[in-house]
Amino acid sequence: MDPVRNPYAPGAGQRPPELAGRGRELDVFDVVLERIARGRPERSLMLTGLRGVGKTVLLNTLRSQAINHLWGTGKIEARPDQSLRRPVAAALHMAVRELAPRHRAPDRIDAFLGVLKAFAQRAATAGRGGAAPKLRDRWQPGIDVPASSGRADSGDIEIDLVELLTDAAAVATDVGTGIAIFIDEMQDLGAEDVSALCAACHELSQLGAPLIVVGAGLPHLPAVLSAAKSYSERLFRYQRIDRLDRIAADQALCAPAEREQVEYEQKALDLLYEKSGGYPYFVQAYGKATWDHAPRSPITAADVRVAAPEAEAELAVGFFGSRFERATPAEREYMRAMATLALVDGEEGGRDDMDAAVPTAEIARALGRKPASLSPARDALIKKGLIYSGERGTVAFTVPHFGRYLRTQPA
């Protein structure tokens, strides 16, 4: 098989050649866009799921849908060490610039940009806790109009964000369209920023304003939002993004191959689904390796067996190993105990991926430690995005098959 023609694309946020199994999510978002365009009330959208299920790819695809509906859009990636103020200002600047050529009153655009500049510069005047800002935070937006005063510049992120997004929505109303802000890795926002974002979305929904937030994050994102505002459970539409079913996984492999006049034998598809578990990133990784090793079409199960070790070696280094290396020895000990217990619980529950959620009390018992003494390791792993707590008193891996990987590594 010609490696130059290999259609598969395992990569972080890289769109696969065939976006299989996400038709429902795309259809739902089309309805959201149309309803808002007609003045109907709609909720902002939150996508949740493990790493490797294609949340970022789907987020980018939804943004393309919004652009096709002539919406203004902006996208940011949340980081645990960065305030929301600066990136959201940049995202809104981009969104309004997309709408500006269709606005009949340039003065209205300039007025909003003045508010936006004041909002952005407020972040540059003082760091968190009133300390002087770091050099990297002394950012000036590329806005030519002077900063306004008395709007979105109080220094209270919740007050300022409500005012800023309300003004941005008014600009979209003037144009007869909407604005969508896309936020990836949303679970990494600070508590104050999450609270401010919830408050802003609440205000926008009450006004029926044409501005929505589309967030993507790990499975515990709903809990993060709920901890910030009790009404967040009713404020957002939540969509769990999971692994592909068998039909969708076969489509993700076969459709790109057919465009290159290549076919798969059924037993090859059976084995590929067994190896990948239906997780989109793994489907692409195994598909790419199999293509490169297959001598001819149709691709056989023997080709998959030959290629699988290469795919697994690449995943072990780039997908699993890079995350494992970020953990301290104490954190690795914690995860190894998790992996062992997850296997037992997964077998008892009939789980074929064998990475079930594990009670923290059982981890402490397995390590012969008091639960309180393990809290620093658990909290650090959650902060690093390696595990999450979906329910009180339990933890699970954020990466599919991570427990399986750990169980193959020497202690």
Residue ranges and their predicted role:
Residues M1-R43, M94:
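A short, basic N-terminal segment
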Residues P41-T61, L367:
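Walker A/P-loop nucleotide-binding motif
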Residues D110-L161, D167-D174:
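Conserved P-loop NTPase mechanochemical-coupling segment
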Residues P146-P219:
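Conserved Walker B catalytic segment
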Residues A191-E192, A357, L367-K384, R392:
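Short amphipathic alpha-helical interaction segments
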Residues H220-F236:
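Short regulatory helix/loop adjacent to the ATP-binding pocket of P-loop NTPases
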Residues I241-A268, K275, Y286:
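Conserved small helical "lid"/interfacial subdomain of P-loop NTPases
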Residues G278, Q284-P371:
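Winged-helix-like regulatory helical subdomains adjacent to P-loop NTPase cores
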